[in-house]
Amino acid sequence: MIFASETGFGRGAPPSRPRGRTRLLPNRNVAAPADGRVRYAHGMEPTDATAPQIQDSQDGRRAVQRRGTVRVVTVAYNPGEELVRFLESLGRASRRRVRVVIADNGSEHEIVREAAERFGAEVVTDGTNRGYGAGANLAARDLGEDWIVVANPDIVWRPDSLDVLIDAGLNTAGAGCLGPRLLNPDGSVYPSGRALPTLVRGAGHAALTRVWPSNPFSAAYHSQGGNDAVREVGWLSGACLALPAPVWRELGGFDEGYFMFFEDVDLGARVARAGWRNVQVPAAIVVHEQGASWKARPERMIRAHHASARRYLDGVYSAPWQAPLRWAVDGGLRLREELEVRASAPRPPRRGRRK
């Protein structure tokens, strides 16, 4: 779950949007990665041959465009030291004016307050835990900045990564939601830009991904290909998202009907339906540490994930004549849910052989 509006985003009216399908419009002046090279997917190439070069400043950091203001919101629920790493690395991720708001969804210790005081962040809470999307919406209330960035508290920002992400948004026509390249702690790339799930694609992915990870259904769902290219995708992982404030307001933020999981899929679908583009920017890099707050309760998370999946697909296949399809999807997801819960249950220790 906020930068300059000199290119049409921000306090003025949003740029005109195409009706129906989102048009593929070119990028201009997207900030380059450290090696100075930017790669573009087909249809996303810059048209301005005089795009500015990235230059080193006196302190050795790359000079980037400094336009607008940003609100970074994050949702915390019993976080560990990853929240400190999140806030500490955020200070190196941007030279813009950044306001940080933490939604505390009911932490049982003082680390949220202590970290906020140390790094100058704000903490908001309504005293309940209504889920990730509701927490992000609470932290985004009365949004007065130009851009909003929603990010998990368990990510570590690479230097300048937030500026690179926002610069791409400022220079990509019709960009309504942008996401960085997510790295796992071991350095491997997490597939954070994906195609919207459909029944066939989702069923194939669910059935085959464990036994055949490279199957075509999973490859299509993960939208693999052009990993180094700025490209348009169906939706972006909610671990880190940047939206122009007018787009966030138009969409009303996250759908709070999703307690956890799929709120980012739903947001991506609504971004596209409104005529905006979901854009992945691999030159902006963050590391997703995947904190342990949910791993201690795998059954609860598995059930929340499947409940959200059913809710999303019920909306996609909502026509009366599709009722049998919804029933079949619901039954399949409930079966998969029980199998995953059973597999996640701790196994009793093996007894040694009797001598």
Locations of the language-model features?
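Glycine-rich, basic loop-to-helix element that forms the pyrophosphate-binding segment
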Residues: 125-143
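A conserved acidic beta->alpha catalytic loop
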Residues: 89, 102-112, 128
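Conserved donor NDP-sugar-binding/catalytic core segment of glycosyltransferases
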Residues: 158-191
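Short, acidic, metal-binding catalytic loop of nucleotide-sugar glycosyltransferases
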Residues: 88-97
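A short, conserved alpha-helix in the catalytic core of glycosyltransferases
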Residues: 226-252, 256-285
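Short, flexible, basic/aromatic active-site loop/helix in glycosyltransferases
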Residues: 197-233
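Active-site-adjacent helix/loop segment of glycosyltransferases
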Residues: 9, 269-347
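Short aromatic/hydrophobic "clamp" motif used to bind/position activated sugar donors
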Residues: 148
